[in-house]
Amino acid sequence: MLITIVAAAAMAGAMGQMPRAETVVRPLTYVSLEPVPRGRNFEVAVVAEIQPGFHINANKVLEDYLIPTTVEPDLPNGIRLTEASYPKPLLKKFEFSEQKMAVYEGSVTIRLKLSAQPDAPLGETKIPVTLRYQACNDTACLPPVRKNLPVILQIAPAGTTAQAVNPEIFKKK
């Protein structure tokens, strides 16, 4: 009987324990070219691995009160954003919402299409990127999170041969 009570208490404690919001999503960044020649287009991908049992809101939320997932680059001189591309969300119903919600689960790739301008400074270039999300499980949401992610690339003179890198991330669809 004592073992049953201890086991039940341990399970209740584990079920009620929510992880820290910062630990639910593990993001990594990838660049499509190495180096990036001046005048060339390239991509940066933010791949977010979402802990099982959790989801994050899509970029286009269906209710005004929801916090959308966003990727915001702080572009240095000579780099321009041409497009941000978010994946198609899942539509799911949860206990805490009367309506279906647009969410991401599992692994999510957000792509930024960028251009290295003809006057982009040569050498190492850092593009700070901020991932903003709110993670939830079926019954509750954690506080919103902003994660600063480093993207480091090399800008080369125009005409330099660029090598496509990270093909598993940037494969054509």
Give the ranges of each region predicted by the language model:
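Bacterial N-terminal signal peptides
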Residues: M1-G13
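Extracellular/lumen-exposed scaffold segments
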Residues: G13-K173
